[in-house]
């Protein structure tokens, strides 16, 4: 599994604290957001790489902020930090653009990952059949349900592209672990390059069944179904407009309710 340490907006110390907490759980794969400013990206990547060590895996994520040529130019500036992939380097449905980026970065051993914003198996088919991506990042809720997810996983197997599910959303990690277990045992039949995203702060206190990791890997869940039964306290605190979360926002002046 891997997790994001280098969120935009965090201070250097907050990033270091996040990395240290991840290391306690055995993580050796870390992701950082990039794209707004090349000088700032280099500065943050330098201390992140030094803190995680040269042997740790580093992923970069641009969240579709670049055009194709801009993505290539920006990533060439970051090759010294040895990232294993650049995630969402350009628009989600620009298949030709992803292929151009992939071909340009191949000599630097930087892969292209995308898929968390792709809503259709047809777009995944185009990305896979053209060889435009190195890592297939399905989103369990962006696609149209279990059948669509299964279709994409099977297509990825046909083209020998590892599936690395997106987990950046409340409940997503609870769902993708089931797909990952099935894929790694029965479809891909390997864990090689099958990086599954893990974000604990999007799960804590929300669900009765908490996800667990050990030595940087998910522990198979024991709860029934997806494991998405919500804690009553969390639900009550977030009920609109009577929950404590909304009342606090109203009292702070950040949001006003009209009777």
Name each region found by the language model.
Residues 11, 40, 136, 221, ...:
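Basic, gly/Ser/Thr/Pro-rich low-complexity segments located predominantly at protein N termini
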Residues 82, 93-225:
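Shared catalytic-loop signature of beta/alpha-barrel
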